[in-house]
């Protein structure tokens, strides 16, 4: 069973992602957190995947998320990091996230407009 930590600024969106993952047919153990607690929760649960929202506001800024990804790769090398960004409201940020994936700084990314089934399947494949 894959352990997934969900760290979203928008609690409603986080609940929707968590619910979708929990109902996915392969099964996930899903934990939700916010901001600076994400790293501790990933370590405590031996997370396989961190799904984290990126916004223009701290502590969800891209630079902070990339720092978190670096720390997780050092302390929990098996944990994959996938970022979620709103490509409609934040097109420049979405482009920066896409480049971070191309540069190997993160393991994956999703636009907030993707379906919950697609998101679940891609997280399972990470």
Protein language model features and the residues they cover:
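Two-component signal transduction core modules
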Residues: 50, 81, 108-109
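Proline-centered flexible-loop/turn and helix-kink motifs
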Residues: 26, 74-77
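Output/docking surface of receiver
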Residues: 86-125
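Conserved phosphotransfer microenvironments
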Residues: 49-75, 85-88, 92-96
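Extreme N-terminal starter segment of soluble prokaryotic enzymes
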Residues: 1-4
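Two-component/phosphorelay signaling modules centered on CheY-like receiver
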Residues: 11-35
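Acidic, metal-coordinating helix/loop segments flanking the phosphotransfer/catalytic sites
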Residues: 32-49, 57-59
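Conserved acidic carboxylate
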Residues: 7-8
